[in-house]
Amino acid sequence: WSRKKNDPVIPDNLIKYAEDNWGEPDEVYFYEDYTLKNERRKFAGQFPQTIQFKYHIRYCDHHLSHARYGYWTSPFVDCTVLVVDAIGEWDTLTQWKVFDGEFIKQKSWTYPKSIGLFYSAMTQAAGWKPNEEEYILMGASAVKKHKIENYNIVKEMWNNDVNFHTGININFDKFEIASIAQEIYEEEFKKIIDEIEDDNLVFVGGCALNVSANRFLTMFNTFIPCNPGDGGSAIGCVIDKKIPANAYLGYEIPGEYPVTEIIQELKQNHMVGVAKGRAEFGPRALGNRSFFADPSLL
């Protein structure tokens, strides 16, 4: 809406669009408890944050909002929900058992222990933007094999519960950093899922976007929603019944898909942007908002 990627500000035109289409809300739900979050920020030596909005705001526990979104859009009645991200208020990993809509927390990791914060710190150490370009780190992890001595340095930091929220001071090649980060993440991820005793698993949180590590989930009937990160949590705040999983929740642009025109443009070695129908909801959206090009020209 603002044409700024990951804009932290809610754009005025988005609010107006919602009001024009659905009316003014009685209250607004937000996917973090700011009282608890500011307690954690104070503990970490950070300044508190506030939200200013013209409507009354009700707060929801962050990891519960993740879990609710994943469960209610899944095909399961009874299942385990695993939430792994950088950080919520205090939780960085939670595991829930859900029986017919009743959520029971089984385990949790709390700040500063966080495999998500570790991965973000490694993203920053490699020269990419933390909390945004972790997908680049994941892709880069396959480029180069790391040296075992450098792996041991980072692994020791993880084993000694280093607080990665402040970053990590290493000077390895960025592709080696990526390789080390992915290997340690996958080692810890396998330990986590090996302790799950269930056939049905819902996996949510920002770490659910690490599609390379998700190959270890084939032992379960696994459901990962289209937007497992904080965007999905906005739905998780308010949802309380099963709805069909559907990624087409964004702004609608009418018109037919211009297949013939796209083909002609590609034949002329052009790059083509296509916007048609409702935009997909989630960071891995592809289809109704796409760029096309002939990769043989690269």
Model segments located where?
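Short acidic/glycine-rich loops and adjacent helix/strand connectors
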Residues: 1-298
